[in-house]
Regions:
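An acidic/histidine-cluster motif and surrounding catalytic segment
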Residues: 1-95, 99-210
Length: 210
């Protein structure tokens, strides 16, 4: 299975971690390659060019998130990876530069979209050494089931199509809030296949804009 590892060409600190993520993915059987993402300024150009709009359903959290340049860059980067998934017509694994693949449970059969880390920031994995299992992801914000981070998930082409359609019809928000039960059945695998190496993110930096 192909895997995309998101990095930013303009941000050197993402380069080596992304290479390490790619190496870890290959070690567990993935056909991994680097995928150049969008900085805030290029994301803003993309949003304008594609006539996209933000999704503001009411809660202030959505506007607070969308005002961060890193959030917009991350969302457009994932949108482009979904488009690549559809173009290839293949199920793909999507990783970010600070991801580390730690097992091959990404191979476990699932319905539409599979999150690869049930216990974010918890190490060691509480499910380590157990039989692989897929279950509904129980993570909710603002009354919606959403992804808990976008650093590691598997997406099928039909699901990617629905996510793309939602981006153009409903609007954009932070990528992990955008991926929700409105568009797909979100499941999670245990033990984890991916962990995140860094609790700090460019999406949380209000001053990140290049």
């Amino acid at each position: 299975m192909k895997a995309f590892v998101l990095f930013l060409r303009e941000v050197e600190s993402t380069h080596q971690p992304a290479i390490d993520a790619m190496i870890s993915a290959k070690a567990y059987g993935l056909d991994a390659e680097m995928f150049e993402g969008y900085t805030p300024s290029r994301a803003d150009e993309y949003i304008k060019r594609e006539n996209l709009k933000p999704y503001f359903p009411g809660p202030k959290l959505y506007k607070i998130k969308w005002n961060k340049g890193g959030v917009r860059g991350c969302m457009i980067s994932h949108l482009e990876m979904w488009k690549k998934c559809v173009e290839l017509d293949e199920t793909v694994v999507i990783l970010e530069h600070d991801s580390v693949v730690v097992s091959d449970t990404w191979k476990t059969p699932f319905d539409q979209l599979l999150h690869l880390d049930k216990h974010r920031f918890v190490d060691p994995d509480p499910d380590l050494d157990k039989e692989s299992n897929v279950e509904k992801l129980e993570h909710y914000r603002k009354g919606q089931q959403q992804l808990q981070g976008t650093y590691g998930y598997v997406v099928k082409p039909e699901t990617a199509k629905r996510l793309i359609r939602g981006a153009y019809e409903e609007g954009l928000t932070a990528a992990d809030m955008f991926v929700k039960d409105l568009y797909c059945n979100i499941q999670v695998v245990t033990p984890r296949a991916v962990k995140v190496n860094n609790q700090e993110s460019l999406t949380s930096n209000r001053d990140f804009y290049i």
